[in-house]
Protein backbone atom coordinates (compact mmCIF):
# COMPACT_ATOMS: atom_id res chain seq x y z
CA UNK A 1 0.00 0.00 0.00
CA UNK A 2 1.45 3.30 -1.03
CA UNK A 3 0.20 5.70 1.66
CA UNK A 4 -0.27 4.32 5.16
CA UNK A 5 -2.39 7.34 6.11
CA UNK A 6 -4.92 6.83 3.31
CA UNK A 7 -7.75 9.17 4.29
CA UNK A 8 -9.99 10.83 1.71
CA UNK A 9 -10.98 14.50 1.76
CA UNK A 10 -14.36 13.59 3.29
CA UNK A 11 -12.71 11.83 6.24
CA UNK A 12 -13.45 8.27 5.07
CA UNK A 13 -10.66 5.74 5.55
CA UNK A 14 -9.56 4.12 2.28
CA UNK A 15 -8.75 0.45 2.71
CA UNK A 16 -5.99 -1.11 0.56
CA UNK A 17 -6.94 -3.00 -2.58
CA UNK A 18 -6.46 -6.76 -2.95
CA UNK A 19 -3.31 -6.40 -5.03
CA UNK A 20 -1.71 -4.23 -2.34
CA UNK A 21 -2.14 -6.73 0.47
CA UNK A 22 1.08 -8.52 -0.32
CA UNK A 23 3.14 -5.47 0.57
CA UNK A 24 1.51 -4.95 3.95
CA UNK A 25 4.51 -6.07 5.97
CA UNK A 26 6.90 -3.82 4.06
CA UNK A 27 4.54 -0.88 4.38
CA UNK A 28 4.20 -1.51 8.09
CA UNK A 29 7.97 -1.53 8.58
CA UNK A 30 8.41 1.60 6.48
CA UNK A 31 5.72 3.42 8.41
CA UNK A 32 7.31 2.47 11.72
CA UNK A 33 10.73 3.66 10.60
CA UNK A 34 9.26 6.89 9.26
CA UNK A 35 7.42 7.84 12.43
CA UNK A 36 9.91 6.46 14.95
CA UNK A 37 11.88 9.70 15.02
CA UNK A 38 8.84 12.00 14.84
CA UNK A 39 7.32 10.58 18.03
CA UNK A 40 10.51 9.78 19.89
CA UNK A 41 9.72 12.44 22.51
CA UNK A 42 6.24 11.03 23.21
CA UNK A 43 6.51 9.04 26.44
CA UNK A 44 3.19 7.33 25.76
CA UNK A 45 4.43 5.46 22.68
CA UNK A 46 4.45 1.68 23.00
CA UNK A 47 6.85 -1.07 21.93
CA UNK A 48 5.31 -3.95 20.00
CA UNK A 49 7.63 -6.88 20.57
CA UNK A 50 9.31 -6.64 17.16
CA UNK A 51 11.02 -3.34 18.06
CA UNK A 52 8.18 -1.51 16.31
CA UNK A 53 7.12 1.86 17.71
CA UNK A 54 3.66 2.81 16.46
CA UNK A 55 1.59 5.95 17.01
CA UNK A 56 -2.19 5.74 16.93
CA UNK A 57 -2.53 7.98 13.86
CA UNK A 58 -0.38 5.54 11.89
CA UNK A 59 -2.03 2.50 13.44
CA UNK A 60 -5.55 3.25 12.22
CA UNK A 61 -5.29 2.41 8.48
CA UNK A 62 -2.93 -0.52 9.12
CA UNK A 63 -5.24 -1.93 11.76
CA UNK A 64 -8.22 -1.88 9.42
CA UNK A 65 -6.20 -3.43 6.62
CA UNK A 66 -4.86 -6.24 8.82
CA UNK A 67 -8.27 -7.20 10.18
CA UNK A 68 -9.90 -7.12 6.76
CA UNK A 69 -7.36 -9.04 4.71
CA UNK A 70 -5.55 -11.20 7.26
CA UNK A 71 -2.38 -12.98 6.11
CA UNK A 72 -0.94 -12.17 2.63
CA UNK A 73 -2.04 -14.48 -0.19
CA UNK A 74 0.72 -13.75 -2.74
CA UNK A 75 4.15 -15.23 -2.12
CA UNK A 76 6.04 -13.16 -4.68
CA UNK A 77 6.04 -10.13 -2.40
CA UNK A 78 7.75 -11.98 0.47
CA UNK A 79 10.93 -13.92 0.98
CA UNK A 80 10.44 -17.38 2.53
CA UNK A 81 8.30 -20.50 2.28
CA UNK A 82 4.60 -21.01 3.05
CA UNK A 83 5.21 -21.41 6.75
CA UNK A 84 7.03 -18.13 6.78
CA UNK A 85 4.06 -16.45 5.14
CA UNK A 86 1.73 -17.95 7.72
CA UNK A 87 3.99 -16.81 10.54
CA UNK A 88 4.23 -13.37 8.95
CA UNK A 89 0.41 -13.10 8.85
CA UNK A 90 0.08 -14.09 12.50
CA UNK A 91 2.65 -11.48 13.43
CA UNK A 92 0.70 -8.76 11.66
CA UNK A 93 -2.55 -9.82 13.34
CA UNK A 94 -0.83 -9.82 16.71
CA UNK A 95 0.47 -6.31 16.04
CA UNK A 96 -3.02 -5.26 14.97
CA UNK A 97 -4.49 -6.51 18.25
CA UNK A 98 -1.94 -4.51 20.21
CA UNK A 99 -2.60 -1.46 18.06
CA UNK A 100 -6.30 -1.71 18.85
CA UNK A 101 -5.62 -1.83 22.58
CA UNK A 102 -3.11 1.01 22.55
CA UNK A 103 -5.33 3.15 20.34
CA UNK A 104 -8.15 2.94 22.88
CA UNK A 105 -5.78 3.63 25.79
CA UNK A 106 -4.16 6.58 24.09
CA UNK A 107 -7.50 8.12 23.11
CA UNK A 108 -8.50 8.19 26.76
CA UNK A 109 -5.05 9.23 27.92
CA UNK A 110 -5.14 12.44 25.87
CA UNK A 111 -7.82 13.82 28.20
CA UNK A 112 -6.65 15.42 31.46
CA UNK A 113 -7.37 13.43 34.60
CA UNK A 114 -9.14 16.31 36.34
CA UNK A 115 -11.88 16.49 33.66
CA UNK A 116 -13.38 13.12 34.71
CA UNK A 117 -16.08 12.92 32.07
CA UNK A 118 -17.47 9.89 30.33
CA UNK A 119 -15.72 8.30 27.38
CA UNK A 120 -17.91 9.86 24.70
CA UNK A 121 -17.45 13.34 26.19
CA UNK A 122 -13.71 12.79 26.47
CA UNK A 123 -13.36 11.75 22.84
CA UNK A 124 -15.44 14.71 21.69
CA UNK A 125 -13.46 17.13 23.86
CA UNK A 126 -10.11 15.85 22.63
CA UNK A 127 -11.05 16.90 19.10
CA UNK A 128 -11.07 20.56 20.16
CA UNK A 129 -7.78 20.45 22.19
CA UNK A 130 -4.38 20.91 20.53
CA UNK A 131 -2.39 17.69 20.46
CA UNK A 132 1.21 17.89 21.54
CA UNK A 133 3.99 16.35 19.44
CA UNK A 134 1.71 15.78 16.44
CA UNK A 135 2.80 17.13 13.07
CA UNK A 136 1.28 17.05 9.61
CA UNK A 137 -2.27 17.56 8.35
CA UNK A 138 -2.72 13.88 7.51
CA UNK A 139 -2.06 12.83 11.10
CA UNK A 140 -4.70 15.26 12.35
CA UNK A 141 -7.17 13.90 9.80
CA UNK A 142 -6.53 10.34 11.02
CA UNK A 143 -7.07 11.42 14.63
CA UNK A 144 -10.42 13.00 13.78
CA UNK A 145 -11.44 9.83 11.96
CA UNK A 146 -10.65 7.70 15.04
CA UNK A 147 -12.63 9.99 17.33
CA UNK A 148 -15.60 10.13 14.95
CA UNK A 149 -15.82 6.33 14.81
CA UNK A 150 -15.60 6.05 18.60
CA UNK A 151 -18.17 8.80 19.11
CA UNK A 152 -20.73 7.19 16.79
CA UNK A 153 -20.29 3.81 18.49
CA UNK A 154 -20.67 5.18 22.02
CA UNK A 155 -23.67 7.33 21.17
CA UNK A 156 -25.49 4.48 19.44
CA UNK A 157 -25.18 2.17 22.48
CA UNK A 158 -25.33 4.56 25.42
CA UNK A 159 -28.07 7.04 24.55
CA UNK A 160 -31.77 6.19 24.15
CA UNK A 161 -34.59 8.19 22.58
CA UNK A 162 -35.95 9.36 25.94
CA UNK A 163 -32.59 10.35 27.47
CA UNK A 164 -30.78 13.56 26.55
CA UNK A 165 -27.16 13.72 27.62
CA UNK A 166 -25.11 16.93 27.68
CA UNK A 167 -21.51 16.74 26.49
CA UNK A 168 -19.37 19.56 27.98
CA UNK A 169 -16.72 19.22 25.24
CA UNK A 170 -18.31 21.71 22.84
CA UNK A 171 -21.71 22.33 24.46
CA UNK A 172 -23.74 19.80 22.46
CA UNK A 173 -26.69 17.68 23.50
CA UNK A 174 -27.14 14.26 21.90
CA UNK A 175 -30.59 12.68 21.79
CA UNK A 176 -32.33 9.93 19.84
CA UNK A 177 -33.45 12.50 17.28
CA UNK A 178 -29.97 13.83 16.52
CA UNK A 179 -27.45 16.45 17.66
CA UNK A 180 -28.43 20.02 18.51
CA UNK A 181 -26.83 23.00 20.18
CA UNK A 182 -27.44 23.42 23.90
CA UNK A 183 -30.44 25.68 24.54
CA UNK A 184 -31.92 25.20 21.05
CA UNK A 185 -35.41 23.65 21.01
CA UNK A 186 -36.05 20.29 19.44
CA UNK A 187 -38.28 20.00 16.37
CA UNK A 188 -41.14 18.61 18.46
CA UNK A 189 -40.95 21.65 20.78
CA UNK A 190 -41.02 24.28 18.02
CA UNK A 191 -44.70 23.90 17.09
CA UNK A 192 -46.09 24.30 20.67
CA UNK A 193 -43.79 27.29 21.25
CA UNK A 194 -45.03 29.04 18.10
CA UNK A 195 -48.66 28.32 18.98
CA UNK A 196 -48.16 29.76 22.47
CA UNK A 197 -46.56 32.90 21.03
CA UNK A 198 -49.40 33.32 18.52
CA UNK A 199 -52.05 33.08 21.25
CA UNK A 200 -50.67 36.03 23.20
CA UNK A 201 -52.58 38.55 21.09
CA UNK A 202 -56.06 36.98 21.00
CA UNK A 203 -59.02 39.15 19.97
CA UNK A 204 -60.73 38.25 23.26
CA UNK A 205 -58.05 40.23 25.12
CA UNK A 206 -58.71 43.28 22.97
CA UNK A 207 -62.47 43.03 23.55
CA UNK A 208 -61.87 42.71 27.27
CA UNK A 209 -59.73 45.84 27.19
CA UNK A 210 -62.49 47.78 25.42
CA UNK A 211 -65.08 46.66 27.95
CA UNK A 212 -62.77 47.72 30.77
CA UNK A 213 -62.30 51.18 29.26
CA UNK A 214 -66.05 51.67 28.82
CA UNK A 215 -66.77 50.46 32.34
CA UNK A 216 -64.47 53.18 33.72
CA UNK A 217 -66.65 55.95 32.27
CA UNK A 218 -68.70 57.85 34.90
CA UNK A 219 -72.27 56.56 35.04
CA UNK A 220 -73.96 59.75 36.18
CA UNK A 221 -77.74 60.08 35.85
CA UNK A 222 -78.86 62.37 33.03
CA UNK A 223 -81.95 64.50 33.56
CA UNK A 224 -84.32 65.56 30.82
CA UNK A 225 -86.69 68.51 31.12
CA UNK A 226 -90.42 68.13 31.39
CA UNK A 227 -91.82 66.32 28.38
CA UNK A 228 -94.48 68.99 27.98
CA UNK A 229 -91.74 71.52 27.16
CA UNK A 230 -90.16 69.53 24.33
CA UNK A 231 -92.21 69.50 21.12
CA UNK A 232 -95.67 70.50 22.19
CA UNK A 233 -96.56 66.97 23.21
CA UNK A 234 -96.75 63.81 21.17
CA UNK A 235 -100.11 62.11 21.22
CA UNK A 236 -98.42 58.71 20.97
CA UNK A 237 -96.46 59.12 24.21
CA UNK A 238 -97.96 57.53 27.32
CA UNK A 239 -100.07 59.83 29.47
CA UNK A 240 -98.15 58.82 32.57
CA UNK A 241 -94.94 60.00 30.95
CA UNK A 242 -96.44 63.37 29.94
CA UNK A 243 -97.71 64.09 33.45
CA UNK A 244 -94.26 63.87 35.03
CA UNK A 245 -92.43 67.23 35.24
CA UNK A 246 -88.98 65.68 35.47
CA UNK A 247 -87.41 62.32 34.79
CA UNK A 248 -84.00 60.72 35.30
CA UNK A 249 -82.23 58.19 33.09
CA UNK A 250 -80.42 55.44 35.01
CA UNK A 251 -78.32 52.62 33.58
CA UNK A 252 -79.99 49.27 34.04
CA UNK A 253 -78.43 46.08 35.33
CA UNK A 254 -77.56 44.95 31.81
CA UNK A 255 -75.43 48.05 31.33
CA UNK A 256 -72.15 46.83 29.82
CA UNK A 257 -72.18 44.14 27.16
CA UNK A 258 -68.96 42.22 26.64
CA UNK A 259 -69.39 41.67 22.91
CA UNK A 260 -70.09 45.18 21.58
CA UNK A 261 -68.99 47.33 24.59
CA UNK A 262 -72.30 49.17 24.78
CA UNK A 263 -74.54 50.65 27.47
CA UNK A 264 -78.32 50.46 27.47
CA UNK A 265 -80.28 53.24 29.22
CA UNK A 266 -83.93 52.48 29.90
CA UNK A 267 -86.48 55.17 30.67
CA UNK A 268 -88.01 53.68 33.79
CA UNK A 269 -90.92 56.13 33.95
CA UNK A 270 -91.77 55.51 30.30
CA UNK A 271 -91.66 51.73 30.55
CA UNK A 272 -89.30 49.00 29.41
CA UNK A 273 -90.06 49.60 25.73
CA UNK A 274 -88.31 53.00 25.75
CA UNK A 275 -84.51 52.86 25.89
CA UNK A 276 -81.33 54.15 24.26
CA UNK A 277 -78.34 51.97 23.41
CA UNK A 278 -74.99 53.81 23.62
CA UNK A 279 -71.97 52.33 21.85
CA UNK A 280 -68.43 53.68 22.20
CA UNK A 281 -66.87 54.60 18.86
CA UNK A 282 -63.62 56.34 19.74
CA UNK A 283 -62.28 58.84 22.25
CA UNK A 284 -65.08 61.29 23.08
CA UNK A 285 -67.51 59.89 20.47
CA UNK A 286 -70.51 57.64 21.05
CA UNK A 287 -73.35 56.28 18.95
CA UNK A 288 -76.88 56.50 20.41
CA UNK A 289 -79.48 54.09 19.02
CA UNK A 290 -83.06 54.79 20.23
CA UNK A 291 -85.42 51.90 20.71
CA UNK A 292 -88.18 53.50 18.60
CA UNK A 293 -89.12 56.68 16.75
CA UNK A 294 -90.76 58.28 19.79
CA UNK A 295 -87.52 58.25 21.77
CA UNK A 296 -85.66 59.49 18.70
CA UNK A 297 -87.99 62.52 18.34
CA UNK A 298 -87.67 63.42 22.00
CA UNK A 299 -83.89 63.24 21.98
CA UNK A 300 -83.67 65.15 18.69
CA UNK A 301 -85.81 68.03 19.95
CA UNK A 302 -83.96 68.16 23.26
CA UNK A 303 -80.55 68.39 21.61
CA UNK A 304 -81.63 71.09 19.16
CA UNK A 305 -83.23 73.26 21.85
CA UNK A 306 -80.85 72.57 24.71
CA UNK A 307 -77.16 72.69 23.74
CA UNK A 308 -76.40 72.39 20.01
CA UNK A 309 -72.66 72.99 20.57
CA UNK A 310 -72.41 69.93 22.77
CA UNK A 311 -74.64 67.50 20.87
CA UNK A 312 -74.42 66.46 17.24
CA UNK A 313 -77.02 64.26 15.56
CA UNK A 314 -76.42 62.30 12.34
CA UNK A 315 -78.44 59.70 10.47
CA UNK A 316 -77.41 56.94 8.10
CA UNK A 317 -80.44 55.66 6.21
CA UNK A 318 -78.51 52.88 4.49
CA UNK A 319 -76.90 51.26 7.49
CA UNK A 320 -79.06 52.27 10.49
CA UNK A 321 -81.81 54.89 10.11
CA UNK A 322 -81.97 55.34 13.89
CA UNK A 323 -78.25 55.78 14.51
CA UNK A 324 -77.14 59.02 16.18
CA UNK A 325 -73.75 60.33 17.21
CA UNK A 326 -72.85 62.03 20.42
CA UNK A 327 -69.63 64.07 20.46
CA UNK A 328 -68.29 64.97 23.87
CA UNK A 329 -66.05 68.07 23.77
CA UNK A 330 -65.50 68.72 27.49
CA UNK A 331 -64.38 66.51 30.34
CA UNK A 332 -67.37 67.35 32.57
CA UNK A 333 -70.88 66.14 31.85
CA UNK A 334 -73.67 68.72 32.23
CA UNK A 335 -77.37 68.07 32.57
CA UNK A 336 -79.26 68.08 29.26
Curated annotation (Swiss-Prot):
Protein name as catalogued: Surface presentation of antigens protein SpaN
Keyword Cytoplasm: yes
GO cellular component, one term: cytoplasm
Family: Belongs to the SpaN family.
Signal peptide segment: none
Location in or out of the cell: Cytoplasm
Chain intervals for the UniProt region annotation (Disordered): 300-336
Native source species: Salmonella typhimurium (strain LT2 / SGSC1412 / ATCC 700720)
InterPro entries: Invas_InvJ, SPAN_dom
Known function: Involved in a secretory pathway responsible for the surface presentation of determinants needed for the entry of Salmonella species into mammalian cells.
Biased composition (Low complexity): 319-328
Protein origin, superkingdom: Bacteria
Pfam families named among the record's database cross-references: SPAN
Amino acid sequence: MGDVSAVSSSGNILLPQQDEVGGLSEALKKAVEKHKTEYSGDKKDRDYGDAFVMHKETALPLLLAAWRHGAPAKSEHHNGNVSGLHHNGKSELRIAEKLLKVTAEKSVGLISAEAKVDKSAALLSSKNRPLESVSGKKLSADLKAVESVSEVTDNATGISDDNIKALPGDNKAIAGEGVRKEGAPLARDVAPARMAAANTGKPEDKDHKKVKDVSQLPLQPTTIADLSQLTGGDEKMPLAAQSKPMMTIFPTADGVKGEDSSLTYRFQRWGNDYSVNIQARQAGEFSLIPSNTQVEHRLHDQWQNGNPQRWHLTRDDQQNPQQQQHRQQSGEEDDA
